[in-house]
Amino acid sequence: KDLLDVVEKIRPDFIVTYRHLHSEAWRWPYSLGEHLDVLIRVIEAPVAIMPHPDREGVPEHAMKNTGSVMAITDHLAGEDVLVNYAAHFTSLGGTLHLTHIEDEATFERYVDAISKIPEIDTDIAKEAIHAQLLHDPSEYIDSCEQVLKENGADLNVVKHVTHGHKLEEHRKAVGENQ
């Protein structure tokens, strides 16, 4: 409650904190911690969540260097605010990774529904929808790169657009680009 009162009084535009704030539960990597869980649900300001400072295995450069920044969300297209934040965090000459993962399980559920409509050729629909779902975020990333360059941003944009299991693909993208 004290933390929420302070945040409400100050009304910051942006918050940077770490997982398991005011908690000893940081040893268990599967939650954000009770304070942070409440904070991100009740405030409107965006929150950058960093690893707990006592956590082992965090690469040393992760807390000192932002030469490689990855924007991750469910659907990247239209997320201008997220892209802008990520671009601002990327060091001059650094790399901004823009990531869109189309969830395979959701896609297959829709294809299954389409397959039950006799008037629609399922194979054609599956192929066309799949291509379009990957094309849209790819075009969006291209437009982001163009706008960033037009505005003088000194960074490289790397596009990650794929489909699969979201968590696995996000882990893979992060692991390959550390």
PLM feature segments, named:
Residues 43, 143-158:
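A structural motif corresponding to the C-terminal end of an alpha-helix
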Residues 1, 65-127, 149-156:
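Small/aliphatic-rich secondary-structure junction motif
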Residues 134, 138-145:
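Short, surface-exposed alpha-helical segments at coil->helix boundaries
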Residues 32, 79-82, 166-167:
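Amphipathic coiled-coil/heptad-repeat helices and related helical stalk/stem segments
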Residues 29-33, 62-64, 84-85, 111-113, ...:
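Short, glycine/charged-enriched secondary-structure capping and boundary segments
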Residues 1-2, 161-169:
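Charged docking surfaces used in two-component/phosphorelay signaling
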Residues 3-59, 169-178:
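Gly/Ser-rich helix-loop-strand patches that form or flank binding pockets
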